[in-house]
Regions:
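Cysteine-nucleophile active-site neighborhood
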Residues: 1-30, 34-36
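Amide-donor transfer/coupling interface in amidating biosynthetic enzymes
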Residues: 15, 29-132
Length: 132
């Protein structure tokens, strides 16, 4: 919930998504560059805080990532997740937080995607180098 909490704290708005749980792999547009990422959320940012800029969007999520006018950034997706990690979480959540249909759709979303976890690690490292 970091992305949503940051937006809300700094004057934006976060609320439950119009759609149900969004889990699995989705494509985000990073200012013209498309990347597949792992997602698991229901809440999302719906109002951009003053001084923040949208740096990524998705078809179902207008505020997929934010860059602030101070040393901070936040993302709707989960660069720390791996497919294996999500599959294990799906096993635990099935029947509690997720329906069988949610789990099946999420697993199906992993087909034909290429997720580069190192890309976001490099971006995070660059961010900290720039602001340390």
């Amino acid at each position: 919930f970091g992305h949503q909490i940051m937006a809300d704290t700094f004057g934006g708005k976060a609320e439950k998504s119009q759609i149900a749980n969004v889990v699995g792999a989705r494509q985000f547009d990073f200012q013209g560059k498309l990347n597949d990422v792992y997602v698991w959320h229901r809440d999302q940012v719906t109002g951009v805080p003053p001084g923040a800029q949208i740096t990524a969007t998705a078809g179902y999520c207008a505020v997929g990532a934010l860059s602030y006018d101070f040393p901070a950034a936040s993302v709707q997706f989960h660069p720390e997740y791996t497919e294996l990690h999500l599959r294990k979480m799906f096993e635990l959540a099935s029947g509690y937080f997720l329906t069988t249909e949610d789990v099946n759709a999420a697993i199906a979303s992993f087909k034909n995607v290429e997720i580069d976890g190192k890309l976001f690690a490099a971006e995070a490292a660059d961010f900290f180098r720039l602001h340390s």
